[in-house]
């Protein structure tokens, strides 16, 4: 039992570590691509535009990493958080968002105000679905974490951040549907993406410490012999 728990902790730490490193890599890659030709305007042009050009493969890789790290986060979340602190709907929505990110990595966008090709249309629609599903999924997960005692960071903070992320994502979606001439579209999109990554990064850092923190939920002391006590963890359970 003890050995399986140790292995479980190791696997969970590995997954969460991969998520944390993945987020840093996503940010680094986007900065690098932004600095390379053809130097798209980050304020007015979408992140996806960076995937069109001589170094577009780097942005495509960036999108793939973003989708994979979300999937890894889902697996780690399920392993570390007890069932009463999980939201099945939230995890499903986050999974849909991850698949959408992987899809848009292979469906290039069109560098036009409105999509003009099949792959451009697929990219635009799937990207909007990804924004909404990810933001709503994060909010549902944040609400479910209120059932986990001593959760760090505070579920109240996570709910607030998730609400801001969802509202901002809706604004991004509305701006696309209403008009394609908004000159700060690129900035709006990047802020929405950043808010989502900040939420995932914050929770990942908290969960990375979760299994080993003293005083976390489910940790209790039971006697093993007269005058002796043995510390045992009931939650979280690792399988």
Where are these regions (language model features)?
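Hydrophobic, aromatic-enriched alpha-helical segments typical of multi-pass transmembrane helices
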Residues: 4-211, 217
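Short, conserved interaction/coordination micro-motifs, predominantly
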Residues: 1
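Short, highly charged, low-complexity non-transmembrane loops/tails of multi-pass membrane proteins
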Residues: 212-238
């Amino acid at each position: 039992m003890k050995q399986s728990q140790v292995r479980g902790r190791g696997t969970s730490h590995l997954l969460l570590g991969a998520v944390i490193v993945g987020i840093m890599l996503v940010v680094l890659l986007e900065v690098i691509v932004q600095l390379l030709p053809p130097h798209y305007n980050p304020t007015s042009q979408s992140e996806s535009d960076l995937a069109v050009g001589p170094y577009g493969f780097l942005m495509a890789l960036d999108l793939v990493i973003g989708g994979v790290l979300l999937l890894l986060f889902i697996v780690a979340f399920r392993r570390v958080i007890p069932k009463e602190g999980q939201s099945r709907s939230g995890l499903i929505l986050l999974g849909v968002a991850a698949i959408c990110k992987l899809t848009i990595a292979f469906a290039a966008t069109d560098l036009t105000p409105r999509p003009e090709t099949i792959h451009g249309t697929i990219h635009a629609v799937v990207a909007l679905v990804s924004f909404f599903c990810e933001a709503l999924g994060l909010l549902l997960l944040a609400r479910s974490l209120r059932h986990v005692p001593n959760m760090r960071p505070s579920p109240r903070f996570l709910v607030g951040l998730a609400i801001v992320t969802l509202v901002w994502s809706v604004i991004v979606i509305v701006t696309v549907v209403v008009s394609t001439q908004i000159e700060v579209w690129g900035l709006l999109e990047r802020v929405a993406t950043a808010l989502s990554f900040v939420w995932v990064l914050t929770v990942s850092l908290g969960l990375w410490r979760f299994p080993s923190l003293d005083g976390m939920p489910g940790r209790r002391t039971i006697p093993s012999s007269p005058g002796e006590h043995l510390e045992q963890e009931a939650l979280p359970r690792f399988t």
